[in-house]
Amino acid sequence: MAHIWLLPLIFLVCILLAVFNHKKHPKYRQFPCPPGFPIIGNLHQIGELPHQTLWKLSKKYGPVMHLMLGRVPTVVVSSSDTARQVLRVHDLHCCTRPSLSGPRELSYNYLDIAFSPYDDYWKEVRKLCVQELFSTKQVHSIQPIKDEEVKKMIDSIAESASQKNPVNLNNKCLELTVSVVCRTAFGVSFEGTVLNSDRFNKIVREALEMLGSFSAADFIPYVGWIIDVLTGLQGRRERSKRDLNAFFEQMFDLHKEGKKEGNEDFVDLLLRLEKEEAVLGNDKLTRNHIKAILLDVLLAGIDTSAITMTWAMTELARNPRVMKKVQSEIRTQMGNRSMISFEDMDQLEYLKMVIKETWRLHPTTPLLLPREAMSEFDINGYTIPVKTRLHVNVWAIGRDPDTWKDPEVFLPERFMDNNIDAKGQHFELLPFGGGRRICPAIYMGTTMVEFGLANLLYHFDWKLPEGVEVKDIDVEEAPGLTVNKKNELLLVPEMRRSCG
């Protein structure tokens, strides 16, 4: 009978908390804000694909929208103008990251680039990566690896073409990026090694899921961690960290034993800097720093390029006119050469438009990683208090009718008469983010996508499987920190006769 008082007591506590919050934060009333519940706020409205849910809410509440996610005040911006205010005008006010359970666990307490707070350490590690890992010189130096791995992909697809078998392009694009990244970062080929096992793919998938998963501890203070333990999320995070740690140690052992192949790779470079006692911020470079940096290289490098290539091929299959036009450009430029070179990419203007249009409709990270306000500032007359989390919904910006004519139509020609690029200075198109937290590997990622797509489109014509029509190709999204195509993209390759 004692439990009969429990529900009324909980209800009373919720009411008191709601009243307390209302009085404590009167300035939040000025924000357009969907109604929420005590304790959980608007968490129940987020859904499996938050960028889509927030886009729908922004249609009603505007491009600057306030939410309470649990006990965390959150502002979502959904237009190019408000994104410009966050990423350029007020960048220095909000370029740090909030403390989040998944990133803290997997990044060795924020020793990486993506999730590290804005401080001297972050500045130094970013500078190191820009100069040593992602520089133009480094991108050019790994081109022979790309050439070899693309050749393997083409040969594999050619075998399917000879038998008229459909190809799973989700898998092919992922295999290519995994192979290139693993050889570049670890000096180890994907094919015929431990990296070729399901185990490796599961490690990568699980780590990405843990970085992007909802953690109650991040939104509900004091008791949220209990929910994470009871749901098993905390246990999964700990296992994911152990698996990643074991993988990195295995890579270090291969380098110590001299069993890796090729020239100096990322691990070689970082181990050399560790030996030289390089300083990052106030700390010397340690093995944990190296693991955290490699985590960013591994997860971001593999996933984002593969996802963009998959979405591009999806949209081309849905739009035969565009497919024909981009193939014509590539084949006219290449003639009958057997292989495309890196230097050829500069001449493929329409291909670049296709990729931009893919980024517009299918940004790999539809919600940029969250920022946190370090000092108070205003957007469109609304005050953003300290400790407010900020999300830039680039998926919504790509569908904003005030910015794009016919935003749901895949039309690469929209980039023909403007200078919009993806380097973070044009806030209509932000696949790599913007401001101080822009992705440092833009050039490496862009060249990987361009080179992979150009070869797929040069060497093969792509047909739909028997019984499948263009209208049957879906664009459903899989949930996650990065958003891939939910269902497989199966297309039948036909070898181009003049280069076969």
From Swiss-Prot:
Q: What is its main location?
A: membrane
| Top-tier EC class | oxidoreductase
Q: Which residues cross the membrane?
A: 1-21
Membrane topology qualifier = Single-pass membrane protein
Q: Which UniProt keywords apply?
A: Heme, Iron, Membrane, Metal-binding, Monooxygenase, Oxidoreductase, Transmembrane, Transmembrane helix
Residues engaged in binding heme:
C439
Q: Show the GO cellular component annotation of the record.
A: membrane
Q: Single GO molecular-function term?
A: monooxygenase activity
InterPro entries to which the protein is assigned, alphabetical: Cyt_P450, Cyt_P450_CS, Cyt_P450_E_grp-I, Cyt_P450_sf
Which Pfam families does the record associate with it? p450 (PF00067)
Where does it localize?
A: Membrane
Write down the EC number. 1.14.-.-
SUPFAM superfamilies for this protein: Cytochrome P450
Cofactor(s) the protein needs: heme
Q: Which family does it belong to?
A: Belongs to the cytochrome P450 family.
Q: Per its record, how is this protein called by name?
A: Cytochrome P450 71B35
* Biological source species: Arabidopsis thaliana
